[in-house]
């Protein structure tokens, strides 16, 4: 076989190899292109899915917050209703307690004829005060205490050698508070002090 024949055969083989390589490269490029398109599609699907998840998550969070707000408002409404009902009950109870107080003041505990009545009213009053104290109702009896305008209402002032100035010398009507909130101030007479003391003055509500 001549050199020319050998060269021609080699060229033919090389062309065949190059053709195969070219075809393989084209096929690979096509596969890679399709793979890239598929990857982009999957990435878009993933992004859409994540967006939906975030949207649903946000909806769940908003719904949970709304439920929490509704629950909180309902609890506040119940608390307000309970406070209103308790305050109304306590205010309606004050005249009963006042009547018991007046009955005790008008009855002589040393008189055998009225001693049993006095003891009965006193026991009933104590039992009632103990019962309402469980609901936060507390009696204000400031006898001998310093005048407190937040809890006491002065109906007058008098000189007194027995009580320092601005001291409650007489409780005309006891006050009451509900859970540390004033229901009614105590009606009191306030001392101006003795003759040697400097005269004290306070606002007196008519």
UniProtKB/Swiss-Prot annotation:
* Cited Pfam families: GrpE
Query: What Gene Ontology cellular-component terms does the record carry?
Result: cytosol
What GO terms in the biological process aspect are recorded for it? protein folding
Q: According to its UniProt record, where is this protein located?
A: Cytoplasm
Which terms are listed as keywords in the entry? Chaperone, Cytoplasm, Stress response
Please state the protein's primary subcellular location: cytoplasm
* PROSITE patterns in the cross-refs: GRPE (PS01071)
Which CDD domains does the UniProt entry name for this protein? GrpE (cd00446)
- InterPro entries according to UniProt: GrpE, GrpE_coiled_coil, GrpE_head
Query: Under the GO molecular function aspect, what terms does this record hold?
Result: adenyl-nucleotide exchange factor activity; protein homodimerization activity; protein-folding chaperone binding; unfolded protein binding
What PANTHER family does the record tag this protein with? GRPE PROTEIN (PTHR21237), GRPE PROTEIN HOMOLOG, MITOCHONDRIAL (PTHR21237:SF23)
What family does the Swiss-Prot or TrEMBL record give for this protein? Belongs to the GrpE family.
Oligomeric and partner information: Homodimer.
Q: Give a short account of what the protein does.
A: Participates actively in the response to hyperosmotic and heat shock by preventing the aggregation of stress-denatured proteins, in association with DnaK and GrpE. It is the nucleotide exchange factor for DnaK and may function as a thermosensor. Unfolded proteins bind initially to DnaJ; upon interaction with the DnaJ-bound protein, DnaK hydrolyzes its bound ATP, resulting in the formation of a stable complex. GrpE releases ADP from DnaK; ATP binding to DnaK triggers the release of the substrate protein, thus completing the reaction cycle.
Q: What is this protein called?
A: Protein GrpE
Instruction: Supply the source organism for this entry.
Output: Shewanella sp. (strain W3-18-1)
Gene name, per UniProt, is grpE
């Amino acid at each position: 076989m001549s050199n020319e024949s050998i060269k021609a055969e080699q060229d033919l083989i090389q062309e065949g190899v190059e053709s195969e390589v070219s075809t393989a490269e084209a096929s690979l490029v096509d596969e890679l292109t399709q793979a890239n398109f598929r990857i982009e599609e999957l990435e878009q699907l993933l992004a859409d899915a994540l967006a939906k998840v975030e949207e649903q998550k946000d909806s769940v969070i908003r719904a949970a917050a709304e439920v929490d707000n509704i629950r909180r408002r309902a609890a506040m409404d119940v608390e307000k209703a309970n406070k209103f009902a308790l305050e109304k009950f306590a205010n309606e109870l004050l005249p009963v307690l006042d009547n018991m107080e007046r009955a005790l003041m008008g009855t002589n505990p040393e008189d055998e004829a009225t001693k049993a009545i006095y003891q009965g009213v006193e026991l009933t009053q104590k039992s009632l005060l103990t019962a309402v104290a469980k609901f936060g109702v507390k009696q204000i009896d400031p006898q001998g205490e310093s005048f407190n305008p937040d809890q006491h209402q002065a109906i007058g002032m008098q000189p007194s050698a027995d009580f320092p100035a601005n001291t409650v010398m007489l409780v005309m009507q006891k006050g009451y508070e509900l859970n540390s909130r004033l229901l009614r101030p105590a009606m009191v007479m306030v001392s101006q002090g003795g003759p040697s003391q400097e005269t004290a003055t306070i606002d007196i509500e008519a």
